Regions:
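Residues embedded in well-ordered regular secondary structure
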Residues: 1-84, 267-268, 657-662, 677-678
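Conserved small-residue
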Residues: 1-32, 130-131, 135, 398, ...
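Extracytoplasmic gating/loop element in the C-terminal half of outer-membrane beta-barrel translocons
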Residues: 10, 14-19, 174, 241, ...
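Acidic, glycine-rich flexible loop segments
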Residues: 14-41, 55, 134, 138-166, ...
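Predominantly transmembrane beta-strands of Gram-negative outer membrane beta-barrel pores used
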Residues: 55-85, 101-105, 192, 197, ...
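Extended hydrophobic/aromatic segments used for targeting, binding, or gating
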Residues: 78-119, 266, 645
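Extracellular/periplasmic, surface-exposed regions of secreted and cell-surface proteins
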Residues: 103-112, 117-122, 130-131, 137, ...
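Glycine-rich, aromatic-lined ligand/substrate-binding cores of catalytic
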Residues: 204, 604-637
């Protein structure tokens, strides 16, 4: 009813005839004809209110003085929360995993230790064969209109009939029901072997270690496609191409079949992954009275096969050297120096290796005589560090993998065709994809940290305070100011500077009163980055530039309000404004609204301020803990699904707030959204602060209640511990966004919803 009212109002506001007839509007209001004029809640029809999850884990450890072992096995079974309306198969988002790990440590001699570790997992994911990624699947569900069909009636898929409904006949079942299903099985194996040899006979405290690791993955995807018949409801009197039984009611609703149920087809695909890692190191630790020294020299190398890139057949390799020296005097004065020397395939031989040093120091004041044995201050340490790290990876925006061999031109790119000469036919061919840059080198990040660690009141209160500053330079990026028209992509350059600074606070209170122990942990962090330099097209309007703003800062138009007759100083909007249309600010005062009026609006999608609070207690076998997390100074730019009522094609869904918050003559003083219109969509739904929403939230992330049993029979059977518990995840959320999960940085688009999980469990140890 709201949808029909809104759409009719939009057409009326634009001086056009309403789309829905009075009969249809009244039927929606009264629900008097739910087959011809349905009002379907697709979320209720498609989703269960809950789905089961089962998890188990078994750990076994033991051994002798020289041989020790640890074995772990686990399983996880998660059922999807889609309702299965097609009983021919299960098309839900189910997930099943079995994981295992076995560790074996052997002391071959008093100075020789061999560690053999093996682990892995087997996973199976079941999914509906919709042909879309998960976001697009949920986007289509959001798009479904309530009158596009009644859904499943008497086991039949009933779709809306355009004879009676003028728009919006893509229903919520269309992209998931009767289309088949798929399953992906993944098998991952992780192996590593480490040998540690003490070399005290060379010099005391010296040891040599060598480690090799091998990881392998294989996946097999099976897809089974099919189709299913659907039906359209008709009044019998409108089915003029068929004969009807004598005396039948002309207003009776009959179903006319559309399509046939198809056979299930089969397709499969395979994937694989493989990588190895090796390192060799000398490690030395030695004490000379109150002087404590250590040193490390390490070589590492890795290779990844079948990487996600333009060259999956060429393995990706890394090689590096690491050095570290530490010194402390009487656990009072501490200093550490590190160096890294790493090589990457992405740079030319002259720039392939990067040198990355770091140094840190600390002073434990409570080791000094003036603070030692202080009744209030149990521990106090100040520290500082400075270091440089490197990055060699460039991820083009919108791609799922990183570019490789950035110093070389991409040799070719298969094109869809080219028209040679005067002919009109397309000829296949290849062309150079992008330039290389032989002068490219490592992106660098210089990091500083200054902190204080403390413990007070007999260690009841402890915590740390940190200030950090980071400056990224030589950022890997492509130029955006080159005015020349190129036939291929520009090369990656060392282009860009970004700074980041912030503070972190961690506080812990832990106290015991007789049998009652309680604790609380608080952590708060604030960080803000800024683009110091970015290759931008120069503009006389500095407020349009990204330089000086955080990375990912949204830009758009500032909103003055909604238009009303007699409104003064209104710039040209390239559209004749009507009452209830959005009016934007003309920031450059040139009398027109365009991209030169766009400025920074809202915050980036990542929060600037994060916080977490843990509370808990233990008392005579009972234990309780809960974790609250929150964030603020973060925004989401709503995409078309959440922004535009009726969508781009004017026949998609209408969200409830888009109806209740719209401008009307009666709500002009309180309206939050523009009037219902079709003609004014281009103006009203431009990128502006109207569609940047506060994504601050407070969430009860985790809560756990448990009880440890101490029963007489337990020692008799070798049972050391038995605990029952209940845990809950994502139980409560307080936020202003409402339409999606505020904790997800992509919550401005439709996505698989966050799950509220409640577990009951038993933990037994022997």
């Amino acid at each position: 009813y709201d949808y029909a009212t809104f759409l009719n109002e939009a057409y009326t506001n634009d001086g056009k005839d309403p789309k829905f007839t009075p009969e249809a509007v009244e039927a929606f209001r009264t629900h008097s004809n739910p087959i011809i004029y349905p009002d379907t809640d697709w979320m209720e029809l498609l989703f269960k209110s809950s789905a089961p999850q089962t998890q188990g884990n078994v750990n076994i450890s033991g051994g002798t003085e020289r041989v020790r072992y640890f074995i772990s096995m686990g399983m996880l079974d998660q059922k999807g929360f889609f309702k299965n309306h097609d009983t021919r198969y299960d098309a839900n988002f189910n997930f099943n995993r079995y994981n295992y790990r076995a560790n074996l440590d052997i002391d071959f001699t008093k100075t020789t230790l061999v560690a053999i570790n093996m682990g892995g997992r087997v996973e199976k994911r079941n999914f509906p064969r919709s042909g879309d990624d998960i976001n697009q699947l949920f986007r289509r569900i959001y798009w479904a209109t309530p009158f596009s069909g009644p859904g499943i009636v008497d086991g039949k898929w009933i779709k809306g009939n355009s004879q009676y409904l003028p728009v919006g006949l893509s229903d919520g079942l269309g992209n998931i029901y009767g289309r088949g299903y798929g399953s992906k099985t993944t098998n991952v194996v992780n192996l590593d072997l480490a040998l540690t040899q003490k070399l005290d006979f060379v010099t005391k405290g010296l040891q040599f270690k060598i480690k090799v690791a091998y990881n392998s993955g294989y996946d097999h995807t099976k897809e089974r496609a099919t189709s299913i018949e659907s039906y359209q409801p008709w009044y019998r009197k409108d089915v003029t191409w068929m004969e009807h039984p004598a005396g039948s009611d002309p207003n009776e609703v009959v179903y006319i079949q559309d399509g046939e149920a198809g056979l299930i087809s089969y397709a499969e695909s395979f994937g694989k992954s493989r990588d190895w890692y090796a390192e060799a190191s000398f490690d030395w630790k030695r004490d000379f009275g109150l002087h404590h020294l250590s040193a490390l020299a390490l070589y590492n190398q890795s290779k990844t096969y079948y990487p996600d890139s333009d060259y999956p057949g060429i393995p990706r390799g890394y090689v590096g050297l690491v050095g570290r020296v530490t010194y402390d005097y009487d656990n009072k004065y501490l200093i550490e120096g590190n160096v890294g020397y790493n090589g990457s395939e992405n740079f030319a031989p002259g720039n392939r290796y990067g040198f990355f040093p770091a140094v840190s120091g600390g002073w434990v004041l409570t080791q000094e005589e003036f603070l030692k044995d202080n009744p209030v201050v149990n521990f106090l340490k100040i520290r500082a560090s400075y270091g440089i790290v490197g990055n060699d990876r460039y991820h083009p925006y919108g791609t799922g993998f990183m570019d490789r061999f950035l110093y070389l031109p991409n040799s070719y790119f298969i094109g869809s065709g080219y028209q040679f000469g005067t002919g009109t036919s397309w000829s296949p061919g290849a062309y150079e994809k992008s330039f290389g840059n032989s002068g490219l080198s490592w992106e660098k990040s210089a990091k500083q940290n200054y902190g204080i660690d403390f413990s007070l009141f007999n260690q009841k209160l402890s915590g740390s305070i940190d200030y950090f500053y980071e400056k990224r330079t030589d950022i890997l990026a492509k130029a955006s100011t080159d005015p020349i028209i190129h036939a291929m992509s520009l090369p990656v350059l060392n282009l860009g500077i970004v700074s980041n600074k912030g503070v972190e606070l961690n506080l812990k209170w832990n106290h015991k009163i007789n049998s009652f122990r309680y604790w609380t942990n608080l952590n708060v962090s604030y960080a803000k980055n800024k683009i110091v330099y970015q290759d931008e097209v120069p503009s006389e309007y500095t407020y349009t530039l990204k330089t000086g703003h955080p990375v990912g800062q949204p830009f758009g138009l500032k909103v003055r309000g909604f238009y009303y007759e007699g409104m003064e100083d209104v710039a040209d909007h390239s559209y004749v404004l009507k009452e209830g249309d959005v009016v934007y600010e003309d920031l450059n005062h040139d009398g027109k609204i365009d991209d030169n009026d766009k400025t920074a609006i809202g915050y980036p999608s990542y929060p600037l301020l994060n916080a977490g609070l843990t509370l808990g207690f233990e008392y005579k076998g009972f234990d309780f803990s809960m974790l609250w997390v929150g964030a603020t100074k973060t925004s989401r730019v709503l995409e078309e699904t959440f922004r535009k009522p009726l969508g781009e094609t004017y026949d998609r869904s209408l969200m409830s707030h888009q109806f209740t918050d719209r401008w009307t003559p009666e709500t002009a003083a309180t309206a939050k959204l523009p009037r219902a219109t079709i003609d004014g969509v281009k103006n009203n739904y431009r990128d502006s602060e109207l569609w940047v929403k506060d994504a601050s939230y407070l969430r009860l992330k985790n809560i756990e209640i448990g009880y440890n049993f101490r029963l007489p029979f337990m020692p008799k059977i070798g049972m050391e511990k038995m605990r029952v518990f209940m845990t809950g995840y994502n139980l409560l959320t307080f936020d202003k966004l409402k339409i999606s999960d505020p904790e997800s940085m992509s919550s401005g688009v439709p996505q698989y919803p966050v799950m509220r999980v409640i577990n009951f469990g038993l933990n037994v140890s022997f």
